[in-house]
């Protein structure tokens, strides 16, 4: 018998907007997004992970379809509102994975140490859901020195 997981979004989650860089790029931070984030940790712990075939410094496993669908239903209206997109804008998920950095900082190659851009399309968004506390890192935003 398959175990059922709670993928429900916390309706009391707080949304904070910050603006970064010279262009004041809008970033949304949603704290306490999931009602039961431990369910995702349990799922991730039970999945087979493989080395990613790009410069990603770790391993990945596809997220469950049910979770991906729930995530999309929850974040699309938030993105549409805060980025002033038309309702039912057609945003879709292209990839949803559990990811775990496994290389130590000293083992990273030059490309893995460099800041990167996820995409340059105006209506492509990255959604990151951290399942660990801040002791395990986070995300930072940088600007290339020559463009300052």
Task: Describe each PLM feature range.
Residues 1-148:
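Fe(II)/2-oxoglutarate oxygenase catalytic core
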